[in-house]
């Protein structure tokens, strides 16, 4: 078999492949064995028609398409390897010659990976992130943890305040007419949660138990129910009950409840500070890496084929569908609720998809330029890390993945990202007051 590659404009080229006649004849034999099983010819049992009779009655041409289907996949794969091209989409194939006793010749218009012209990726100026944990940040984390232990207590006297949870009855109307979904009794609403129409929760502040009030709000212009969008509505609202969060005081007992390794408040604070400091350092490093990746990508010039963007969009839509499925929705239901269709969703995602492709091509090109590879030791370390993280054995991970190619590529790219950050020039950011 022979193959030639002729580069055309942009990211396309013409692959011309010639398969020798002896392989064509073998493919025709295979095609005949398949087709003859489906043929009925008077005087012969089904599947027992001799080849000469078949060709006399139907012509050898009746076998050509099946022979092409047999020859093409392997021939195309071998041609790709022989010419060392990297297709990014299915080719457009045109058969030039298929005939018994002659070579099989076909041409394939192929879109390949684009040329990547790297810009500066070393010595990038990136902002140094703050890693020191402040006392305020520690206290905020303590308050957050204590908040999970808070109990809801009925407010016997007093008025609704931000952060309270109120139990209300309400009935909404537009132009004096009630609308679907605008009525409820015994509804619990946390003030300040932002879960109601803008302006509704704020108007409940200052109300007392058993007090009634007309709450007037305007639906957002982009409201999902088109018949209500932009319209003013009045909600007759009654407060049935007011509850507030009673947060426990941090004691040695509570400290141990929050952290089994801490027996005192001081030990709890020390352990928490250590964990938070480690997390802040990790987060800071990740932010620095992201900035380095973005700048290296921005400095790179690539003419990205539309096919690569579409492939990435397919992946992103699939990821999105999986995420909303975890919330009990499917894509069609989401489209009905949001008023979008898949075309609009893909258009909304297109810029991100293009950036993802460009970033991946940039990092891969840097790996090649710097001759960065993932060693067996690197892969073993990553497998051990995953084993601890997900609490499953290394063998189970290998069996699930089938091979370690994905891990190998991930480790390789992570090495590139480390190189970008390690070779960056850090500048101090402007601290906010």
Swiss-Prot record:
GO terms for molecular function: peptidyl-prolyl cis-trans isomerase activity; protein folding chaperone; ribosome binding. The keyword Cell cycle applies. Keywords: Cell cycle, Cell division, Chaperone, Cytoplasm, Isomerase, Rotamase. GO terms for biological process: 'de novo' cotranslational protein folding; cell division; chaperone-mediated protein folding; protein transport; protein unfolding. One of its GO terms (cellular component) is cytoplasm. Residues 163-248 form the PPIase FKBP-type domain. Gene3D superfamilies: 3.10.50.40, Trigger factor ribosome-binding domain, Trigger factor, C-terminal domain. The keyword Chaperone applies. It is found in: Cytoplasm. Its EC number is 5.2.1.8. It catalyses: [protein]-peptidylproline (omega=180) = [protein]-peptidylproline (omega=0). PROSITE patterns: FKBP_PPIASE (PS50059). Coiled coil: none annotated. It comes from the Bacteria. Consists of 3 domains; the N-terminus binds the ribosome, the middle domain has PPIase activity, while the C-terminus has intrinsic chaperone activity on its own. Involved in protein export. Acts as a chaperone by maintaining the newly synthesized protein in an open conformation. Functions as a peptidyl-prolyl cis-trans isomerase. HAMAP family: Trigger_factor_Tig (MF_00303). Belongs to the FKBP-type PPIase family. Tig subfamily. This is Trigger factor.
